[in-house]
Regions:
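Non-catalytic terminal extensions of PLP-dependent enzymes
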Residues: 1-120, 245, 295, 299-312, ...
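Conserved phosphate/anionic-ligand binding catalytic regions in large, soluble enzymes, centered on
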Residues: 58-78, 125-133, 263-278, 316-327, ...
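Conserved PLP-enzyme active-site core in the AAT-like
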Residues: 101-104, 131-299, 307, 382-383, ...
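Long, K/E/R/D-enriched contiguous segments that form extended
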Residues: 110-111, 117-120, 125-136
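General small-molecule cofactor/ligand-binding pocket signal
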Residues: 123, 176-178, 400
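Short, well-ordered loop/turn and helix-capping segments at boundaries between secondary-structure elements
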Residues: 142, 146, 170, 197, ...
Length: 473
């Protein structure tokens, strides 16, 4: 496919008048001295170009998207319409009096998320999951500083979400990793062995990135709190537990949620996202400002939090994402519980269908996702997990997350979400079985995949280390 620059040779987009425009009033330092080298195409050619680009992409509306730990569920299109209503298209610096509708929505979303998590206070400002993580860890850091305790360590299980170590490190903590037990859960003895007065918190995902529920979470909570430490809940996998349990019940002190995952706002390609952070009562004054409050007469932005960590983002978060998430919650109501039920059901169905054909390192009941391994295929025929992922692209399926979590060799992390019906799941099972059989009988066919995509094999190392981002003649 040609770039838009290559398509512009010999064409014009807009023909400007020949009349000279006086630009003498412009300062010399803002006047361009060289050609812009911008492409020029007709409107029709521009439309065709971007339509062609869109046809090269894969999206949830096109086919199955079982990207583990990403919750690529269907995003109701009516929510896009609601987020574009004129009343929400206001400047973030308008006064509270002129933003009552937007502030009311934010207040109601705060209340809804607090009810779902049973936490006590919340901020909507963080704009991504990892941003929420860092916000939560900054709250924990300031809490201990304010009570005069110099705690320097954060415990992170090897089954935690991938961005947890970076978030804790960027907040000034040292990382202490603990290994999982034979069931793929936090090893209590390993936790006890590293738990001392230097430990500020533990960061956990429950269910963890193996898709396994941490059945000893109450014991972990007791041990941490007896040590004066806090528990951080990464909400990456919250789609598995809505209506059945919640972070407060499990003993967590700080929670972040991914609205772009659990609450069905479009994501991928870098955003947009939202990672609200909720806390227990003793931490509410540490939240970033402002939070939205209500005095019985009007909604207002509250900056009066005496121990606040300050602002973590300009303005008040990714507002359009908040609108879509709130619309989703209203649409689903009590059926949020059924969303989790079906997500767990779909994952267990796939796991049972596929474990005969691929290794299953932790054969435990899973929640919303599960992790297979391509070790068998690699050992028998040299077909790696990466090759399996490439072959899936020929079956109108987005590859699952691969090589994560790191504790599973040749990992294949599959999350079907609640959106998919049995026929789609069966098609995926059939494709995965076919790949496993072909890997045995004709491995070269899998090793050379994909065969039907517009772009075949690419040099991923070259693309990552030396990206070519600029067009030149």
């Amino acid at each position: 496919m040609k770039t838009i620059f290559e398509k512009s040779n010999g064409t014009d987009g807009i023909n400007l008048t020949d009349e000279k425009i006086n630009i003498d009033f412009l300062p010399k330092n803002v006047c361009r001295t060289a050609d812009t080298n911008l492409p020029q195409l007709s409107e029709l050619d521009v439309m065709r170009h971007y339509k062609e680009l869109s046809d090269l992409n894969f999206c949830i509306e096109q086919g199955f998207y079982p990207l583990g730990s990403c919750t690529m569920k269907y995003n109701p299109k009516v929510n896009e319409l609601l987020a574009s209503l004129d009343g929400f298209n206001i400047h973030p610096n308008v006064s509270d009096d002129m933003a009552q509708g937007a502030l009311k929505l934010m207040y109601n979303l705060q209340s809804s998320l607090l009810k779902i998590t049973e936490m006590d206070a919340i901020t909507l400002k963080p704009s991504a999951g990892a941003h929420g993580e860092m916000t939560g860890m900054m709250i924990i850091r300031k809490y201990f500083d304010s009570i005069g305790e110099k705690r320097t360590k954060v415990i992170i299980p090897d089954s935690a979400h991938g961005t947890n170590p970076a978030s804790a490190k960027m907040s000034g903590f040292d990382i202490v990793e603990i290994k999982s037990n034979e069931k793929g859960q936090v090893d209590i003895d390993a936790l006890k062995s590293v738990l001392d007065r230097d430990v500020a918190a533990i960061m956990m995902t429950n269910p963890n990135t193996l898709g396994i529920f941490e059945e000893n979470v109450e014991e972990i909570s007791r041990l941490m709190h007896e040590n004066g430490s806090l528990l951080y809940y990464d909400g990456a996998n919250f789609n598995a537990i809505m209506g059945y349990t919640n972070p407060k019940l499990m003993g967590f002190d700080v929670v972040h949620l991914n609205l772009h995952k659990t609450f069905s706002t479009p994501h991928g390609g870098g955003g947009p996202g939202a990672g609200p952070v909720a806390v227990v009562e003793k931490l509410k004054d540490y939240l970033p400002t402002p939070i939205v409050d209500f005095d019985g007469e009007k909604y207002f932005r509250n900056y009066d939090l005496k121990n606040s960590i300050g602002s973590v983002k300009d303005f008040y978060g990714n507002f359009s994402v908040l609108v879509k998430a709130y619309a989703y919650i209203l649409m689903m109501g009590k059926n949020l519980k059924h969303a989790s039920e079906n997500a767990v059901l779909n994952a267990n169905y796939l796991k049972e269908k596929l474990k005969k054909y691929y290794d299953l390192p932790y054969d435990e009941p899973c929640m919303h996702e599960f992790v297979l391994s391509g070790e068998r295929q690699k050992h028998e025929s040299g077909v790696s997990t990466l090759n399996i992922a490439k072959a899936l692209m020929d079956g109108n399926t987005h590859p699952p997350t691969v090589y994560f979590p790191l504790i599973v060799h040749e990992a294949i992390m599959i999350e079907p979400t609640e959106s998919e019906h049995k026929e789609m799941l069966d098609d995926f099972v059939e494709t995965m079985i076919q790949i496993a059989q072909t890997a045995k009988e004709n491995p070269e066919e899998i090793l050379s995949a994909p065969h039907t995509t517009p772009v075949k094999k690419i040099d991923e190392v070259q693309a990552a280390r030396h990206p070519d981002l600029k067009y030149t003649d």
